[in-house]
Amino acid sequence: MEIKITEVKENKLIGRKEIYFEIYHPGEPTPSRKDVKGKLVAMLDLNPETTVIQYIRSYFGSYKSKGYAKYYYDKDRMLYIEPEYILIRDGIIEKKEGE
């Protein structure tokens, strides 16, 4: 799996970086969010606790996927802005009992 950063935008109003990327994975299925997040964090020297993978989109018959991630400068702001289901999906918070 190879990740290429296509665009990085700084959103100063919200306090985050928005990262667009392409993943090349010839002969392999779409990589997991956990694998992609780990590689992005290592490539860009980010904090995994404040990095969220918004989406990874694969195209039928292609070995290339596109994705979008957000890196927040402050964890409290991330918890305030990001929807709960995204935080659960990325393993940042635990699902509440009974839901």
Curated annotation (Swiss-Prot):
GO terms for biological process: translation. Pfam families: Ribosomal_S24e (PF01282). InterPro entries: Nucleotide-bd_a/b_plait_sf, Ribosomal_eS24, Ribosomal_eS24_CS, Ribosomal_uL23/eL15/eS24_sf. The keyword Ribosomal protein applies. GO terms for cellular component: ribonucleoprotein complex; ribosome. Coiled coil: none annotated. One of its GO terms (molecular function) is structural constituent of ribosome. PROSITE patterns: RIBOSOMAL_S24E. Keywords: Ribonucleoprotein, Ribosomal protein. HAMAP family: Ribosomal_eS24 (MF_00545). Belongs to the eukaryotic ribosomal protein eS24 family. This is Small ribosomal subunit protein eS24. It comes from Pyrococcus abyssi (strain GE5 / Orsay). The lineage of its organism: Archaea, Methanobacteriati, Methanobacteriota, Thermococci, Thermococcales. The gene is rps24e.
